[in-house]
Amino acid sequence: MAISTIQIILIFIWSSVVGMGSVLDEFQTHRPLIACSIMGLILGDPKTGIILGGTLELIALGWMNIGAAQSPDSALASTISTILVIVGNQDIQKGIAIALPVAAAGQVLTVLARTVTVAFQHAADREAEKANFTAIIWLHFTALIVQALRVSIPTTIVAVFVSPEEIKSMLDALPEVITGGLAVAGGFIVVVGYAMILNMMSVKYLMPFFYQGFVLGGYLKLSLLAWGAVGLIFAIVYVQLNPKFATNHNNGTGGSGGTVAAAGDHPAALPEDELDD
């Protein structure tokens, strides 16, 4: 498929939003599930965008910045891989093979962009000494634009200068050992990502629910949506039966009914005029 001028403009705008989202973290627009889905919608194939985004999201679950160490750039990997997969009419496995090296290249661009923005922060410090708030605001927005261009420029270059025929021939030229190896590595990364998250979320008194999910999953043929609903129900029931929640409810924080019950059970909690009567 050929990319129209309107699509190129929308790609530039959306990739800029994705780049800013990678440092703002407020709306999570840099996450693969969101970035790929919207990019797929722009290119007219939201289904492929959602599938690719969900697959890359599993891989990127364990990616996180630790101190000054930058994780692979899921934002740039999401935008470029979606364009190459949809425009080049490739499968999801090829998209994973594309995304992993692009994420590594984006990691270098992230370090470079963050290094450049340090100069803007020092300039903002100097303006703060002069109480020049307008300049401080503009300097912060300018630093944010650097993060936007970090993703939008490479993505737009790929969308403008790489034709579908070139994409197809380039990806088809990759040896099977490379694409297959990257696909297997991507599967390992998914497992590692899940393991890291489960290790952080590991709470002994919640582990029975975790094991119960595997047991039920082996016998009940339910969809992921149904399992999500079952998990939500278990969570609600657990919170309602939790002694801490019950204590707060009995103390009156759960509503007017709880307050009346607490007052009836404890005469000392009644007003003084009622005690005098």
From Swiss-Prot:
It is a multi-pass membrane protein. One of its GO terms (biological process) is phosphoenolpyruvate-dependent sugar phosphotransferase system. The keyword Transmembrane helix applies. One of its GO terms (cellular component) is plasma membrane. Pfam families: EII-Sor. This is PTS system sorbose-specific EIIC component. NCBIfam families: EII-Sor (TIGR00822), PRK15065.1 (NF011647). Induction: Induced by L-sorbose and repressed by D-glucose. The EIIC type-4 domain forms the PTS system translocation channel and contains the specific substrate-binding site. Its main location: membrane. Residues 3-237 form the PTS EIIC type-4 domain. The gene is sorC. It comes from Lacticaseibacillus casei. The chain crosses the membrane at residues 1-21, 92-112, 133-153, 177-197, 219-239. Keywords: Cell membrane, Membrane, Phosphotransferase system, Sugar transport, Transmembrane, Transmembrane helix, Transport. It comes from the Bacteria. PROSITE patterns: PTS_EIIC_TYPE_4. It is found in: Cell membrane. The phosphoenolpyruvate-dependent sugar phosphotransferase system (PTS), a major carbohydrate active transport system, catalyzes the phosphorylation of incoming sugar substrates concomitant with their translocation across the cell membrane. The enzyme II SorABCD PTS system is involved in L-sorbose transport.
